[in-house]
A protein has these predicted regions:
Chain A
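Active-site-proximal structural scaffolding
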Residues: 95, 138-139, 174, 232, ...
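Short, well-ordered beta-strand core segments
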Residues: 83, 145-146, 181, 198-200, ...
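A short, well-structured juxtamembrane/interface segment
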Residues: 62-77, 231-242, 323-330
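Extended redox/cofactor-interaction regions of prokaryotic respiratory oxidoreductases
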Residues: 103-166, 175, 271-375, 384-389, ...
């Protein structure tokens, strides 16, 4: 039996770094300190054992060798005039680097799961910048914390304990007792149940509510109607007062803003609110990133291509325009004629109309697990699990990079090995 | 009778814990349901334990659950293939489909809930 201390969790953007992993032989038998989400991932589920292929999408899969599967995948991608390489969030930065090389070689579109998560937040940051901090600063200093359109009690279960609500730090030694917690949401979530104040917004009215708060902060409360987006003026005035009298405030936001009416403009407005709060006190804002390394893809893609995601190499140079080049844009328009889905599950998390097109085109899947994407794939290549069986770098939701160690030895080739062989074969077929 | 609601989709802890276990009954249990508050449930006809969700983008049958954290007229389905059968594909020019704020019609039904494989097979 061996124990790995201070192990990193490869599930959500919190990247908790205090796990204790107990192994026996090449098997993990316990993941101490992990939440339900982290433990479920680390303890594992049924894996795809061997690569698989089928002659058409309604036939049964037949197990094949890695050589055969990589050859078939390379042929699909090379024959494609407009390939899409999507996923990446459950993989380490070293995998992203290889993926971008493959996209460049193919003239493909490369996009990650931020497309259906915090992609709009990136667009807002282009417009307004991001007054933010590390999670450590929030843990040590924040006395007012706002969760807007996010539900960490269910989606980031240890966030409140480690960083934002209950955590005790240098200037926050009383933890929960010294913090005012505000939840703004359209329904009363488990997170709202631990808040000091719950602000219930009408679905899709976040932009108006943020604008009303900005007006009140600017001394223009007189122009604010008695009720805005389902929230009374009285509650808004009280909320604005709580925010501006904080010693150090933090706003965390989630899909409630990025996926509701207004999309990136909601974030744009929330960033402006944060900036304006800095006229009164110190205030920061941070997206609650979902997959543990979805932030890492944005980092790698930005330093390699100049853009965070939805990058189109068809012109020979990186081109980026979400709304035109993001996965769901090109799928719904039936623009792409082949796809490779890796470390993400498009068929589970894309709208039906996008999945219909994925089901109609040649599809390669690289993933440890059988999921809805497998159901519509032509070639399936199982790989080792990043962060559990593969070491490497990932970026936490606050942009801090941390290094994952192996917990156990892999039983499958890594994504990096598969991508390297794929790139090599693509180059050979194209005669490069 | 048919109940008109505003549908939102999103994460839950059980959906997340089964993210890499999507062929299992646990994943179906964690994602193939629709939550309404008790007022709204009262308004639905009771022709079964399930609910048929119909939008401009599709139709899906899921289990009906009560959650009084939802205000009147708000329905919630955990993110996943069942929710995505009825969400809006339009990315409004920024790459993000409409996963929240979809006008939907609900009715009670005794129709069965499709398994993940059966649901995805509809797209082939």
């Amino acid at each position: 039996m061996a124990v790995i201390t201070d192990a990193l969790c490869p599930f959500c953007g919190c990247m908790c770094d205090d796990l204790m992993i107990v192994t026996e032989g090449n098997r993990i038998i316990e993941a101490k300190h992990a939440c339900k989400l982290g433990a479920a991932k680390i303890m594992g589920h049924h894996r795809i054992k061997e690569p698989m292929m089928r002659p058409d999408k309604n036939s049964n899969f037949k197990e094949v060798s890695y050589d055969e599967a990589i050859e078939a995948a390379a042929q699909i991608l090379v024959k494609s005039k407009r390939p899409l390489l999507y996923g990446w969030a459950s993989a380490l930065c070293e995998v992203h680097k290889k993926g971008i090389l493959l996209a460049e070689e193919l003239g493909a579109i490369i996009d990650n799961t931020a497309s259906v998560c915090h992609g709009p937040s990136t667009l807002a940051v282009h417009e307004k910048g991001l007054p933010t901090s590390t999670l450590g600063q929030i843990k040590n200093r924040a006395d007012v914390v706002v969760f807007w359109g996010c539900n960490p009690a269910q989606a980031h279960p240890r966030h409140m304990g480690r960083y934002s609500v209950f955590a005790k730090g240098f200037f926050s030694d009383k933890g929960r007792k010294m913090r005012k917690i505000i939840v703004v949401d359209v329904r009363k979530t488990d997170t709202a149940n631990v808040a000091d104040e719950y602000v219930q917004v009408e679905q899709g009215a976040d932009y108006m509510v943020i604008s009303a708060l900005r007006a009140i902060l600017a001394g223009q409360a007189a122009v604010v109607p008695d009720q805005v987006g389902g929230v009374t003026k009285e509650q808004l005035v009280k909320l604005a007062d709580t925010l501006k009298t904080a010693k150090f405030g933090a706003i965390f936001f989630g899909m409630g803003l990025t996926q509701s009416k207004g999309r990136y403009k909601n974030i744009d407005n929330a960033i402006s609110l944060t900036t304006e709060l800095n006229s009164f006190t110190k205030f920061v804002i941070m997206p609650m990133r979902g997959h543990y390394n979805v932030t890492g893809f944005g980092q790698v893609c930005t330093w390699e291509t100049g853009f965070a995601t939805a990058v189109d190499f068809a012109r020979g140079a990186p081109y980026y325009n979400p709304g035109e080049t993001a996965s769901n844009d090109v799928l719904y328009r039936k623009e792409v004629d082949a796809a490779m889905i890796i470390a993400g599950d498009a068929a589970a998390h894309f709208p039906a109309n996008s999945v219909r097109h994925l089901a109609a085109i040649p599809l390669v899947q690289i993933d440890p697990y059988w999921n809805p994407t497998t159901e519509i794939a032509d070639v399936v290549i199982p790989t080792a699990i990043c962060g559990v069986e593969v070491e490497g770098t990932a970026y936490r939701m606050d942009g801090v990079s941390l290094r994952y160690r192996k917990m156990i030895e892999p039983t499958h080739p890594t994504d990096i090995e598969v991508l390297e062989r794929l790139i090599e074969r693509v180059k050979e077929i194209r005669g490069d | 009778m048919t109940l008109k609601v505003n549908l939102i989709t999103g994460r839950t802890i059980n959906q997340g814990a089964n993210l890499e276990n999507k062929t299992s009954p646990d994943y179906l249990e964690a994602t193939a349901y629709c939550e309404l508050n008790s007022n709204d449930i009262e308004k639905l006809d009771k022709s079964g334990n399930n609910v048929k969700v119909r939008t401009n983008y599709g139709e899906v049958t899921v289990k009906l659950k009560e959650n009084n954290g939802n205000p009147d007229g708000i329905a919630f389905i955990p993110m996943g293939p069942w929710a995505n059968a009825v969400v809006d594909h339009d990315t409004k020019g920024c790459g993000m489909p409409g996963f929240k704020g979809i006008q939907a019609e609900l009715e009670g039904t005794s129709d069965k809930i499709l398994l993940m494989k059966e649901l995805i097979a509809r797209y082939k």
